[in-house]
Regions:
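Gram-negative bacterial Sec-dependent N-terminal signal peptides
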Residues: 1-23
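A residue-level marker of the well-folded mature domains of exported/periplasmic proteins
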Residues: 20-248
Length: 248
């Protein structure tokens, strides 16, 4: 099984509840696109399920650059879309600037807290789920070495890594954890080539189970792990179907 932020899709669903049926909701995906097989796609799945269940519609946009964050927020707010849901912590700064200008618009941000009366912040205890992943990886490992590949090097992803390492240690303190971050910019969420390279490097160090908390970059991790006949663990959405029998 894969680790899932079970409430991510639900957050998009709740935020676009029937109480807002008069106004059309909007969903803004983070960089990487809505079909990243991870974080964005789970938000899209939740919103689409709401649309299917209620017969209502929602607007959406896939960002191409950082500069579009505030533009997209203002565009939807000006159009009267309500609520406006953002998939990702990186919207925090733009939302802080925009929310006060549209007090009658409800905003929802995932993975970050923005303190404003018209903002609902949805955050998770990533380290707790990752602790269980670490226990599972330790139990599955035959080499005594497991790996972790994060996306952007930020406190959020370090919480994933920390919980994972503690879970491994709880099962067997002698197991080695090899950890790498993909990068320090938002591009780290959508670099499957780099994910593949890091996976190969960790395999060369003996890792036979690798956990990816890296958004779209994780696609490269899971693919390479399957190609090299080792196990992987996905994140944010159920990724077992991508490589049956190879994804825990």
């Amino acid at each position: 099984m894969t680790l899932m932020k079970k409430m991510l899709g639900a957050a998009a669903t709740v935020a676009t509840s029937a109480s807002f049926a008069v106004a059309e909701p909007a969903l803004i995906f983070d960089l990487g696109g809505k079909f990243d097989k991870s974080f964005n796609e789970l938000a899209f799945t939740g919103a689409q399920r709401w649309a299917d269940d209620t017969g209502n519609s929602f607007r959406e946009i896939e960002l191409q650059s950082e500069a579009q964050r505030e533009q997209a927020l203002r565009r939807f707010a000006e159009a009267g879309n309500n609520p406006i849901v953002m998939a990702g912590f990186a919207f925090a700064s733009a939302l802080g600037d925009v929310a006060a200008d549209y007090p009658d618009t409800k905003f929802t941000i995932i993975d970050m807290v923005v303190d404003a009366p018209n903002v609902r912040s949805v955050v998770f205890k990533e380290h707790e789920g990752s602790y269980l992943v670490g226990m599972m990886a330790a139990q599955a490992s035959k080499t005594g070495t497991v790996g972790f590949i994060g996306g952007m090097d930020i406190p959020l992803i370090r919480r994933f890594a920390c919980g994972y390492a503690q879970g491994v240690e709880a099962v067997n303190a002698d197991i080695k954890v090899v950890a790498n971050m993909t990068g320090t910019t938002p591009a780290a969420w959508n670099d499957p080539v780099k994910g593949s390279e890091l996976t190969k490097a960790q395999i060369s160090q003996g890792a036979d189970v690798i956990y990816a908390a890296a958004g779209g970059t994780g696609v490269g991790v899971l693919q390479t792990a399957a190609d090299e006949n080792i196990l992987s663990v996905g994140v944010d959405s159920n990724q077992n179907y991508m490589h049956p029998g190879k994804v825990l």
